[in-house]
Amino acid sequence: MKLAVYGKGGIGKSTTSCNISIALRKRGKKVLQIGCDPKHDSTFTLTGFLIPTIIDTLSSKDYHYEDIWPEDVIYGGYGGVDCVEAGGPPAGAGCGGYVVGETVKLLKELNAFFEYDVILFDVLGDVVCGGFAAPLNYADYCIIVTDNGFDALFAANRIAASVREKARTHPLRLAGLIGNRTSKRDLIDKYVEACPMPVLEVLPLIEEIRISRVKGKTLFEMSNKNNMTSAHMDGSKGDNSTVGVSETPSEDYICNFYLNIADQLLTEPEGVIPRELADKELFTLLSDFYLKI
C-alpha cells in the first residue's frame, strides 16, 4: 500500500505522517516514510536528526546509481520505521516532481521500493503544480490533513482536485481527511457535506501534539518514555504515589487516534474520487458559514 499525505503548509503533515507510520508499524507492517520537501525534515521526529537527502547522495556520486547502497539513503527510525528524504532542487530552480521521480527510480534500482508493506509519501504544502503532485502517481491513497479553518479547507479542496485529475490515469483514491489539532469540526463537516469524502479522524486541540514536534519525538516515543518513567517512580514511591498523574490527556490517549487511522487504512477502504467545489462556490460556502456565527 502506498499513501501520499498532503495538506496546507504548516498544518502538521509531518507530525501526522510520522505517527501514522509508527501506528502502521505497530500493526505489524514494514513501513518506509519518504519525505518530499526541500526542508528534508519530514522524518526528523523518527530519526532524531536531519538525514542526508537522495538528491545530495546522488550528487555526491555523480548520479552513478550503481555506486549507491541502501544504507546510503535508507535510515532506521523509531519503532522500526525506515526513512528516506527525497530533498529538493535548489531554490528557484528545478522541479520537485523530478526529485520524487529520481527517488523512486533509485529505490527501485536498490530493490527496495517493493519490499515494504506500506510506503508513505509526506509531501510539502499545497499542490501548486504537477511536479508536487508527482507522489500521487505512485500512491494508492491520498490523505489530506486539515483543520477546521478557512485556508486549510481551501487547500484541501485544491488537493482533492489533483486527486480527481490523477485518478484518470491510475487507480488512485482519496482515503479521507484528517482533522489535526482542532477544537471544533463544524466547518469540516460543512465541507464534506458539500464535497463528500470520508473523515478518518479529528484530533483534538492538544498541546502535546505540537510539543512532540518541538522535542523532535513522535507521540509514541514520548508515551513510551513517560510510561517507563512513571512505572519507575511509582515503583520507588509505592502504590499510593501520584507521580505521573496529569490533568492533561496522556500521550497514550493521543496515540489511539493514530492507531485508529492505521486500522482504517489497513482495511484497504474503497475511498472516493472527489468532486471538488469551484473556488467561488467554496468561498461562498465557508464565508457564509463564518458570517452566520
From Swiss-Prot:
GO terms for cellular component: chloroplast. It comes from the Eukaryota. This is Light-independent protochlorophyllide reductase iron-sulfur ATP-binding protein. InterPro entries: NifH/chlL_CS, NifH/frxC, P-loop_NTPase, Protochlorophyllide_ATP-bd. Pfam families: Fer4_NifH. It comes from Chlamydomonas reinhardtii (Chlamydomonas smithii). Component of the dark-operative protochlorophyllide reductase (DPOR) that uses Mg-ATP and reduced ferredoxin to reduce ring D of protochlorophyllide (Pchlide) to form chlorophyllide a (Chlide). This reaction is light-independent. The L component serves as a unique electron donor to the NB-component of the complex, and binds Mg-ATP. GO terms for biological process: light-independent chlorophyll biosynthetic process; photosynthesis, dark reaction. Homodimer. Protochlorophyllide reductase is composed of three subunits; ChlL, ChlN and ChlB.
